[in-house]
Amino acid sequence: MTMLNLRYRSLWREPLGDYDVVYCFLSPAPMAELWAKARREMRPGSLLVSNSFPIEGVTPDAVIEVPDRRRTRLYLYRPAGPAPKLRTTAWAPRPAA
């Protein structure tokens, strides 16, 4: 079973709803347009990761500071909100008879 599938595609032509994680390293100029597209197309729980450039006017869900020579920051966003919570029930093994 493949757990990771990397694709190099145009963010503008590709439907983003097919992906759990979308990673971009763009200039600040197109970020607002990408944010609008991600909000329209991505599913709840999906992650948009922007390398080095935050989306103006949008608070990231998290920021990761990479310990490299550039002091890279990864800005993490959930455009469609968090994943829905699953209903769970408590389970415990039966005691030995």
Model-derived regions: residue spans:
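S-adenosyl-L-methionine
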Residues: 1-18
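Sequence-level detector for tyrosine residue identity
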Residues: 8, 19, 23, 75-77
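Short SAM/SAH-binding signature in class I
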Residues: 16-33
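C-terminal substrate-binding/active-site "lid" region of AdoMet-derived donor-dependent transferases
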Residues: 29-97
